[in-house]
Amino acid sequence: MLVEDHRNISCGGDPFNYLKSVMKAVSIQLDQGQDAKILLLKEKFPYTRGTFEGLARTTGLVLQEVSEKENEVIVNVRKQKN
């Protein structure tokens, strides 16, 4: 499983576009059927499950789970099989 840790990033731009880039990069790195875990901070990425699901879908990923632990968000995705 690929783990992408973006908890301590300093993003001066739009966090939504940053997250979109992260999802696209994860999609490129994974083979079909592989999983990834993306670690984020809730204060920097205050999005709902629906937002994460939409971003995953547009980048060829399937959202498996979104969980919160204290101020962290853990997003689990899988690369779609064609």
What are these regions (language model features)?
Residues A25, Q29-G60:
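Amphipathic, hydrophobic secondary-structure cores in small proteins
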